[in-house]
Amino acid sequence: MAFIAALGLLMAGICPAVLCDGILGRDTLPHEDQGKGRQLHSLTLASINTDFTLSLYKKLALRNPDKNVVFSPLSISAALAILSLGAKDSTMEEILEVLKFNLTEITEEEIHQGFGHLLQRLSQPEDQAEINTGSALFIDKEQPILSEFQEKTRALYQAEAFVADFKQCNEAKKFINDYVSNQTQGKIAELFSELDERTSMVLVNYLLFKGKWKVPFNPNDTFESEFYLDEKRSVKVPMMKIKDLTTPYIRDEELSCSVLELKYTGNASALFILPDQGKMQQVESSLQPETLKKWKDSLRPRIISELRMPKFSISTDYNLEEVLPELGIRKIFSQQADLSRITGTKNLHVSQVVHKAVLDVDETGTEGAAATAVTAALKSLPQTIPLLNFNRPFMLVITDNNGQSVFFMGKVTNPM
């Protein structure tokens, strides 16, 4: 299973900005910040991230009622947090408040240090799962930006920085797209289809997650089956299946849905939410951070006699400059934008926010001793679910088990 996302913020201004050429390292968090960054506990950051995740999901789902939805709230929020480093006053407050931070209870410094430690932890190599996340600034070559902004993006967000000539739009576009393609292993080959020659700076954030199921599906068991788009339409899909699987499960009768957790090797898991036929909108409208917490807290190991899950690969492409104002981020897109902590003057505004995500789900996984032991140890549990069939639209949430941060959230309405 692989999840890949990239987000690009395109900034235009009267006077272009530049950053000295160079690669900014991943291990340069100043020593004096090491202790302070932990003031914002990872679980606190995760709960805030969940609130933003669900708000954005509802906007995207409303705009795309019958379409697949997939996005990375962590990638989007990290990019916006970096942008807020360069913003002042009400421009900054808008961004952080939409990210669900209460600025009367937490300082701006704590927010950025919390993000910094989270991203630094995720960038550490892990035996079982591949996680690659990072940010990059592409700056026009005409004029320096403030060294303080350069230092903070490097230290807190591990951002790389490159010089680009945006007067040569096609060359600059290829430069940025090639970088993103390389970081996402070719999964996102073209983040930008076009660039404006007035562009002064592009901020890119990417997240690549490759996880292997703790208990994999056997490819030999995959078969062709119906997936019901609605009550009248269906499509043929490759359907994976596995029998006698012991995994966390809950039936939510109040919201008319079943919730299943599948674990990856390593420190991540996927929550699959299967609404009853015709109940998708009811479940979506009821989604709150408390809902996800209730499901997580109520999950109990159950034996699924047979689990069926479609094999699929879907991709999405969003222009978030149309969505973020609906959530409350407006000033960065206007001439009233104050991004003066980037350049020293109020000469920048955001003209484009592009987010692309790719979600691949297949049988891949590796059987390990721990998985076999867990399955065997829990066989004595009395409750058995006869058949759980994901043959209609469903949602999924991919989280980091250590900090509960949401890597990806999506809705699959058509696997093909």
Curated annotation (Swiss-Prot):
GO terms for molecular function: serine-type endopeptidase inhibitor activity. Residues 365-392 are annotated as: RCL. It comes from Rattus norvegicus. The record marks 379-380 as: Reactive bond. The single human alpha1-antichymotrypsin gene (SERPINA3) is represented by a cluster of 6 individual rat paralogs. Pfam families: Serpin. Belongs to the serpin family. Glycans are attached at residues 102, 182, 220, 267. GO terms for cellular component: extracellular space. Residues 1-20 form the signal peptide. N-glycosylated. Gene3D superfamilies: Alpha-1-antitrypsin, domain 1 (2.30.39.10), Antithrombin, subunit I, domain 2 (3.30.497.10). It is found in: Secreted. SMART domains: SERPIN. Its main location: secreted. Keywords: Glycoprotein, Protease inhibitor, Secreted, Serine protease inhibitor, Signal. This is Serine protease inhibitor A3K.
